[in-house]
Design a protein with these regions (language model features):
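Single conserved hydrophobic/aromatic residue that forms the stacking wall/gate
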Residues: 1-5, 9
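Short glycine-rich or small-residue beta-strand-to-loop segments that form or flank ligand, phosphate
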Residues: 24-31, 47-50, 76-85, 92-95, ...
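Short, acidic/small-residue loops that bind anionic groups at enzyme active sites
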Residues: 50-55, 99-124, 130
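Short acidic, glycine/serine/threonine-rich loops at helix termini
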Residues: 37-41, 89-94, 117-124, 163
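Gly-rich Lys/Arg/Thr-decorated short loops/hinges at beta-loop-alpha junctions or inter-strand turns
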Residues: 20-29, 38-51, 115-118
Length: 166
């Protein structure tokens, strides 16, 4: 394990203040290769755990399940997934398993890239840099003591109304 602003485990970067978290926590996932995304956004008021895959590849669901279990401090976990095929597959499989485990998790998907598809066809839009302000907004709501449902609602409203172009 490496220490700094975040602790680094095999494929997880963990906010080193997570152990003291008395709030909703935020977990995200993504492939490596575009640093500082996604692991570079771990820190106070942002992401609590980032799960990294190989270069340009999503991590497996088991790593995400372990991260969610580690992040869960009794207030629930917001699971942010960017709309890319591998990330979505991992995100959906992860959600299926954490629900079976009885964990309180809500998934929010970023799919804001308007270069791919119009708003009416959001499922075909990629999640890109819009995740960064979403992490900050959700992190601020969590830090303010909002419930998981409230944090997720704020994050979802932002996700539904943002657009980027790449």
């Amino acid at each position: 394990m490496s220490r700094g602003l975040g602790d680094v485990y095999k494929r997880q970067v963990v906010n080193n203040k997570l152990k003291d978290a008395d709030r909703v926590t935020i977990v995200t996932l993504g492939g490596t290769g575009h640093e500082p995304a996604i692991s570079g956004f771990v820190g106070e008021g942002m992401v609590d755990i980032s799960v990294a895959g190989n270069v340009f590849a999503a991590p497996g669901p088991q790593a995400c399940i372990e991260a969610i279990k580690m992040a869960d401090k009794g207030h629930g976990v917001l699971f942010v997934v960017l709309n890319h095929a591998g990330d979505m597959l991992t995100g959906n499989l992860t959600m299926k398993q954490v629900k079976k485990l009885g964990l309180n998790v809500i998934k929010v998907v970023t799919q804001e890239d308007i270069a791919n598809a119009p708003r009416s066809n959001a499922d075909d839009r990629r999640g890109l840099v819009g995740c960064v302000p979403l992490y900050k907004i959700a992190g601020a709501a969590a830090a303010a003591g909002k419930s998981l449902e409230e944090v997720a609602a704020v994050a979802q409203k932002f996700a539904d109304n943002m657009a980027t172009i790449a």
